Amino acid sequence: MTMAASEQHGKPFVGELLGRSDYAIIGEIVEPGAKVLDLGCGEGELLEWLAENKGVDARGVEISGARVQRAIARGVSVYQGDIDQGLADYPDQAFDYVILSQTLQETRQPLRVLREMLRVGRRAIVAFPNFGHWRVRLSMLTTGRAPKTRLFPYDWYDSPNIHFLTVDDFEQLARMEGLAVERRFFLAGHSAVGMLPNLRAEVAVFLVRR
C-alpha cells in the first residue's frame, strides 16, 4: 500500500490500509525485511500486515491483556507492557523502526516515550491527531467546551487523550530534542495536506531519527 498518485477534487489522494490512511503511510515508509516494534499495537493488525506484505520482523507492546491475546492468536509476537514505564527489555538500536500510531496523546510521559523509541530504534514513526485542526478550534470557539469532532469523539471525562498536541507542537519538540525529521505527511481524510498543515491537517505522520 502506497500513497496513490491519483487526484481527487484536485487534491493528492492517500489510500487506506486496514481502514486507516495513517497506516497506509506507515506501510509505505517501512522497508521490506526491517525489524519493527509497534508500541500500543492493539490487536496486532498493522504488525500482521507488515509481516505478511513487507516480510518484517514484527514485535509489539500493548497494555491490554485481552488485546495481547488476540494479537498472539494472529501469530504476532506481542507482550503486555506499559510503554510509559520505558522499554528496558530492549537493548539500544534493536529495531529499524519503532511505531507509535495515534497513541502519543494517550501516554502520561510522551517525551520519555519518544526518547525511549529513539534509544531502541534507529528511526521512529509517530502519528497523532492534530489538535490544531480548524474544526477543533471552531468547536471550542463556538461552544466554549471541550471539543468533540471526528478525531476527538470523546467527552472530556472519558477521553483516553491526556496530552493534546498540534503539528507545530511536535515540530517544536523535534527541534528541542535535536531530531532530524526525515519525512512528514499531513492528512485530512484521504487527502494529503500541503499548505497550513497545523490548521488543515487532521492527522500527522512523522519519520524522525537522532
State each model region's role:
Residues 17-33:
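Conserved alpha-helix/loop element of class I SAM-dependent methyltransferases that forms part
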Residues 111-116, 123-210:
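S-adenosyl-L-methionine-dependent methyltransferase catalytic module, highlighting the catalytic core
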Residues 4-18:
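Class I SAM-dependent methyltransferase Rossmann-like catalytic core
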Residues 39:
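Conserved beta-strand/loop positions that form the S-adenosyl-L-methionine
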Residues 43:
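Conserved SAM/SAH-binding loop
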Residues 49-86:
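Class I SAM-dependent methyltransferase SAM/SAH-binding core
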Residues 97-108:
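A short SAM/SAH-binding and catalytic strip from SAM-dependent methyltransferases
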